[in-house]
Amino acid sequence: AAGILGFFIVNYPFGLIFLGDAGAYTIGFVLSWFGIAILINVPDVSPWAILLTLFWPVADTLLAIYRRSCRKQNVCAPDRLHIHQITMRGLEICFFGQNRRHITNPLTTLVMSPFVIAPPIVGVLFWDQNLNAFLAVLAFFMFLSVAYVYSPRIIRRFRR
C-alpha cells in the first residue's frame, strides 16, 4: 500500500510514469491475495468488507463485461466507456474544452477520489458486520450504476 501511495504522490498530477496494464494487474493480483489471506486467517472478517476494499476495480470490470456482453462485443475488447473516462469527457465538454487533458486528467482524479475512497473506508468500518457490508456493496453498486446511466445525460444538459 505504501508503494502504491508513493507512486500516486510522485506521479500526481502530471502522470509522468505510466503504470500500465501489467502494473495494474500485478497490484490487483497482490491485493486480491491479501484479501483471501485475511479471510482465511481471520474468519470474523466479512467477505463483503473485503470486496468493499476492492470495490471500484471489481465493479468497473463487472460493468464493462456486462456492457460489452449486452452489445455482443468481445468482453476483453477495449472501450472508452469506463466511469473515469466519462467523468473526464464530462469535464472537457462542460468546462474546459478539448485538448485540455493536462487539466482534466488530474482533475478527474480529484473529482472521483471521494467516490473511490468511500467503499474501502466503509469496508474497514464494517469489517465484522456481514449484513451491513453486503448492504453497502449493494448501495455502492447502485450508485455506480445510476452514475453510469445518468452521467451522459447530465453532461449533455450542461454542455458549453
For the regions a language model picked out, list residue spans one by one.
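Alpha-helical transmembrane segments
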Residues: 1-160
